[in-house]
UniProtKB/Swiss-Prot annotation:
GO terms for molecular function: rRNA binding; structural constituent of ribosome. The lineage of its organism: Bacteria, Pseudomonadati, Pseudomonadota, Alphaproteobacteria, Hyphomicrobiales. It comes from Azorhizobium caulinodans (strain ATCC 43989 / DSM 5975 / JCM 20966 / LMG 6465 / NBRC 14845 / NCIMB 13405 / ORS 571). HAMAP family: Ribosomal_uS4_B (MF_01306_B). One of the primary rRNA binding proteins, it binds directly to 16S rRNA where it nucleates assembly of the body of the 30S subunit. With S5 and S12 plays an important role in translational accuracy. This is Small ribosomal subunit protein uS4. Keywords: Ribonucleoprotein, Ribosomal protein, RNA-binding, rRNA-binding. SUPFAM superfamilies: Alpha-L RNA-binding motif (SSF55174).
């Protein structure tokens, strides 16, 4: 088992939810967390515990973003006008690796991060290899010509159901995606409920 698959399984098991909607998620087979003490019955979480869990779930969904980087995203969200929770989701969905994942150019958020890191993606015609790069409205993201025949890409596109979110305009033949607008929370296709308001409460303690 690769480290990325192991990490995904751990996150699902710890959360007790299939946060990416994968058919092979371990929570489809059992309801307890990872480790030797995973089968113990969980007590009711405190308010802090509920907030922490919401933060860990959101961090995990976007590929286990490090705490320092995730907190920096929250700080930026809190400085923007409007609802901080909505701003947080908007900033996370503007990450280049998230856009590549949403466009279904690769199968997972973990693969998207590696794909960007290895220089397979261009934004407005220029190569960008920073997964956290903030895509702007109107930007065009594309897979580099030399990378379009990679097995990872071909398999992902072949399996894609084309149900990309409305805020992206995707051409799977050309492997391009235009970021049309910053999404609202209810537009983001999360397989499970995300609660950015609890994340805001966690950091506002």
């Amino acid at each position: 088992m690769s480290k990325r698959i192991s990490a995904k399984h751990k996150i699902d098991r710890r959360m007790g939810e299939n946060i990416w909607g994968r058919s092979k998620s371990p929570v489809n087979r059992r309801e307890y967390g990872p480790g030797q003490h995973g089968q113990r019955r969980k007590g009711k979480l405190s308010d802090f515990g509920v907030q922490l869990r919401a933060k860990q779930k959101l961090k995990g969904y976007y590929g286990s973003i490090g705490e320092k980087q995730f907190h920096a995203v929250y700080v930026e969200a809190s400085r923007l006008k409007g609802d901080t929770g909505a701003n947080l989701i908007g900033l996370l969905e503007r990450r280049l690796d998230a856009v590549v994942y949403r466009a279904k150019f690769v199968p997972t958020i973990f693969a998207a991060r590696q794909f960007v890191n290895h220089g397979h993606v261009k934004v407005n015609g220029r190569r960008v290899n920073i997964p956290s790069y903030q895509v702007k409205v109107g930007d065009v993201i594309e897979v580099r010509e030399a990378s379009k025949q990679m097995a990872l890409v071909l398999e992902a596109v072949q399996l894609a159901e084309r149900d990309v979110p409305d805020y992206l305009e995707v051409d799977h033949n050309r492997l391009t995606a235009k970021f049309n607008r910053i999404p609202e929370l209810n537009e983001v296709p999360y397989p499970v409920q995300m609660e950015p308001n609890l994340v805001v409460e966690f950091y506002s303690r």
